[in-house]
């Protein structure tokens, strides 16, 4: 698994996820977002938390896929699949802290993706960005996220 910067090819995933009204109660989203809005966001984000005051990364999962259905699994190549996104937001450079949030695609839930993504983001945030604190604000109804963050030591 890896975290990477958003690319224009991620627009279909972001459009689907941001407009999933069932998730709005667990986020600050109150209205649908257009493809144009999301395209502008992708075009304007620098990937620099100091400039944007937030950092959104795409969660990619590596998987082996056969080159040809006739070939054995020995002849395979590594492919990636987008399975979610994870954010640092409400960045406070002076106090070196930020909030964390994530979205895991329904087909990837319950497989440890969220926990692994949080660990990767923490490693980057504490090791490279030198943050002192990452905090999570979670809806009481979002038991899946509450469970992940509790396992990771968030209280």
Where are these regions (language model features)?
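Helix-loop element at the rim of GNAT/NAT acetyltransferase active sites that forms part
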Residues: 1, 16-33, 48
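Alpha-helix boundary/capping detector
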Residues: 29, 39-44, 49, 114, ...
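Acetyl-CoA-dependent GNAT
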Residues: 33-68, 72-109
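Conserved N-terminal entry element of GNAT/NAT acetyltransferase domains
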Residues: 1-12, 24-25, 69-75
């Amino acid at each position: 698994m890896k975290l990477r910067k958003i690319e224009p090819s991620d627009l279909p995933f972001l459009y689907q996820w941001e407009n999933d009204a069932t998730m709005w109660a667990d986020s600050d989203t109150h209205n649908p977002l257009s493809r144009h809005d999301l395209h502008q966001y992708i075009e304007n984000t620098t990937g620099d938390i100091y400039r944007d005051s937030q950092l959104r990364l795409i969660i990619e999962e590596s998987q082996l896929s056969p080159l040809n259905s006739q070939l054995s699994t020995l002849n395979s190549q590594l492919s990636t699949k987008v399975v979610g996104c994870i954010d640092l937001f409400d960045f406070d450079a002076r106090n070196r802290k930020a909030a964390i949030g994530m979205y895991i695609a329904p087909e990837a839930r319950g497989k440890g993706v969220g926990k692994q993504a949080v660990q990767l983001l923490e490693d980057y945030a504490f090791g490279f960005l030198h943050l002192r604190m990452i905090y999570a604000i979670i809806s009481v109804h979002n038991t899946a996220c509450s469970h992940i963050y509790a396992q990771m030591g968030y209280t």
